[in-house]
């Protein structure tokens, strides 16, 4: 079914001359595209391992209430009955997806990848004897498929006998069989490929077309066997009620802790020796408590990308990483350069790096070649055996030995960001006006506009683990699953510029001349904090800096003692935590963001004297400096949304680790360097591993509950912002997030109900 459209173009130079264009529009293609777009809305994007981002497993159902979405998806139900034909279809689909989406793990590359998944399948399927079983009619049918995936979808729906009114539902069911692979393809088409450029283009239409073709061949009666699945609503409703009970208990406990602290919020403190700005990550909270107890230090909370939407090219790396939230698109390209302290050291580093790259290329070529792997094993076997023995029996020693050898070959050097706008290559760097604008916005958002300390440390965070496909899940989510130290160093460098400070002073932010900014990084696995070299001066306030480094080591020890209680270790705290960061057999190097429960937007004075047990995201905020609510608007629509993604991923990975988690790490296989499978052919697992949320097989460590957001600000400001943004109305009124306002004047707690009314919490 098609239509003709005639377009007439008038020549502006001569109105009597017209050019006529005839276009043929295939209505079926448009209808199928519309259906695919509709069913795609309920698929959650799945990020690759290298930038593993937390996301709500039921993101596509947020238009429903939380309870309706959970019941509809039957989170707690048993698996569907085994269907051999369905499993065969899945197996073939996994084979094609794995081959097409592979990013360097496979020895041979799938032909025609640059033309798309469907095109490649179209050309290769007639040669797949496992699919057509050398049946002549099937092989002929595969050889004469239409060129467009939408046309193939229509052909298959008709061949399978799916009624028109049931086609969209059937497509939803088709996608639901492998939501992990479908979610990864959705990420490629909607998140990775925002600028329209992709080497190997793929879409959910491609995925559905290939899947339906395989279904026609292997499971032609699929539409007749698609039955309404029996729902265990009683079990699910009881599960939801248990979650609600935990939420009520935790909310009351937290509010009781906060109540005595409300009178302390307006107390102004004297100038601190040092201020440390940490990421809002829940793992920062216990460390902040530890360092605040050791001296005249003040800590603040801010999103760990420090307000800078940048892409960063590492000094030693060839890849460029987007170091900002996935909700944002990087605006600036930054690279690093070595600090020219020792030219001989830099030269040694460059030669060593080249030597290591050559060795790595040779090793990779030998390892993935058809004929050389056995020879490689024979020649390197004894050395690999020794390495395996050391890494297994003494991981700390093995790590230290590896580090020393690397230092001998390629000594580490200090680097600094290069961020000044390149007049010859304007795509690199940040203009002065934008440096000033982003620096001002960052300071205002973190509530640091006066009373600056002598030292201000912006502290990003990352983790250190071995043999861990989910390493990026432990790094900074606000930096797109990367480590945040470079963003911290970049903001510090900008704020150390005199011209930037003068411009900020004109806008009401007066930074004292004796204030120095430093970048740093907090290792959340070991609690080590590295303060980066400053290019301004290494002698000003050296006594304060030395004392701070000493106190940071003490804080590390104290926080290790607190954390070890949750890790069920009988060893010395620091020794065991150091081992976890270096042991390649360790399935739980740290707990990550497990037990996260609340997002608190308030001055630090409100929470400073409370042990929040590492369960709260803490964002600094002073409502008295934000009369129009613009800063709060940014906080609620960006970092709070990211916190909700994290919270729901942990929630669903806990209550159903099979459906929404990724199962045990013990049986993980990395697939194509993009994700993990259970065994050698499964769906692409898209949640957190069992070891990230469960202390034992049958006992959860994470407490599944929805995010509780507490905002220290007048209700009228909050209400205006909620009414202004659909995302906030969706999250609050559909009860994906609970919102409590703390009135700064009356000190009363108010809960926002799903009816858009406020009720006092007694």
UniProtKB/Swiss-Prot annotation:
GO MF: zinc ion binding
Alphabetical UniProt keywords: Cell inner membrane, Cell membrane, Membrane, Metal-binding, Transport, Zinc
Disulfide bond residue pairs: none
Listed InterPro entries: DabA (IPR018752)
The keyword Transmembrane helix is assigned to this record: no
Cofactor list: Zn(2+)
A GO cellular component entry from the record: plasma membrane
Residues bound to Zn(2+): 279, 281, 461, 476
UniProt subunit comment: Forms a complex with DabB.
Family affiliation: Belongs to the inorganic carbon transporter (TC 9.A.2) DabA family.
Role: Part of an energy-coupled inorganic carbon pump.
The name this protein goes by in its record: Probable inorganic carbon transporter subunit DabA
Gene of this entry: dabA
